Amino acid sequence: MSFRTIEWRDDKVVMIDQTRLPGEEVYCEYADYKSVAEAIRGMVIRGAPAIGVAAAMGVALGAREIIADTYESFFRQMENVCDVMARTRPTAVNLFWAIERMKRVADENRDKPLDQLREILKTEAIRIEQEDLELCKAIGRHGAALIPEGATVLTHCNAGGLATAGYGTALGVIRAAHDAGKKIQVFADETRPWLQGARLTAWELMKDGIPVTLISDNMAGFFMKRGEIACCVVGADRIAANGDTANKIGTYSVAVLAKENNIPFYVAAPTTTLDLSLENGDQIPIEERHSREVTHLHGFPVAPEGIRVRNPAFDVTPARYISAIITEQGVVSGDYVTGLRGLVAP
């Protein structure tokens, strides 16, 4: 891939600024954990796996900022760093998974000198980034087998390299199918209100030379009914124990349309996106974002001033609409409760 979503470089976190794509390919450097938290909150970086990596690197930066004479003081301040990162975005479980992993590593190394502990945390954050890239490639390999030769694949939002450490989940499946020689093409929903499909997915696929057609969100049913879409592949921000899946707002609508038109609807996500502590999707917290994201487009008003707005960032697709969940460990379908639990069994 010709871009890097996020990396640790010279004791700084470097991210591509996704708010400025596709017009400008700009990389931003962050030297402190609070600025990383703000980048996550402001969607400079987004996508569940990517913000998990960003959170881990933010914690590592925070550990380097802490001034402490005792372990008690260090770990007290570390807890505050982790709390700041955890409050950035509530829906994507990878964020919390990464923070908990960093806290666990810190706790396991309490006997080390503080300078060594800081280096251990940096190494762990980089390891999380590297692992995510490998997970995505494995997801791609498993999912590519589900994509028919010559298929037109519909995807929603951006679950590509920009949403992960690289390669992508849903787009990882598409990339792997393309690399395997299947002559596929992609329909990308524009994905209002942030236009991740138009700005990010279309940009990624065009860079890779994968044929892509942009459609507005309300066109999906039209093309499904005409038989122009063979299957749908989306990513996920949190998957409950029964397979209910939170993903970008509008995913549920696409899944219902796919079911009505007998089109397979696949979810691609690493096992780090599973939250088996939640029985079903009703328990998944849904982030609501600022009304301006709906009323303005690139700073220009597109709605009357003072209009009431609702802006949930995610919705939950019930498991009954999902044909299969593609993970780095394999594909699960049917009995999600048993299948998903089997993926993470010790």
Swiss-Prot record:
Which reaction is this enzyme known to catalyze? 5-(methylsulfanyl)-alpha-D-ribose 1-phosphate = 5-(methylsulfanyl)-D-ribulose 1-phosphate
From its record, what is one biological process in GO terms?
L-methionine salvage from methylthioadenosine
So where's the catalytic machinery, residue-wise? D237 (proton donor)
Under the heading Pfam families, the entry gives: IF-2B
Q: Which residues bind substrate?
A: R46, G47, A48, R89, Q196, N247, K248
Q: Where is this site: Transition state stabilizer?
A: C157
Q: What is its EC number?
A: 5.3.1.23
According to the UniProt entry, its GO molecular function terms are: S-methyl-5-thioribose-1-phosphate isomerase activity
InterPro entries per record = IF-2B-related (IPR000649), IF-M1Pi (IPR005251), IF_2B-like_C (IPR042529), Initiation_fac_2B_a/b/d (IPR011559), M1Pi_N (IPR027363), NagB/RpiA_transferase-like (IPR037171)
What UniProt keywords are attached to this protein's entry? Amino-acid biosynthesis, Isomerase, Methionine biosynthesis
Family under the similarity heading: Belongs to the eIF-2B alpha/beta/delta subunits family. MtnA subfamily.
Function in brief: Catalyzes the interconversion of methylthioribose-1-phosphate (MTR-1-P) into methylthioribulose-1-phosphate (MTRu-1-P).
| Xref: HAMAP family | Salvage_MtnA
Q: What protein does this entry describe?
A: Methylthioribose-1-phosphate isomerase
Please name the source species. Geobacter sulfurreducens (strain ATCC 51573 / DSM 12127 / PCA)
Coding gene?
mtnA
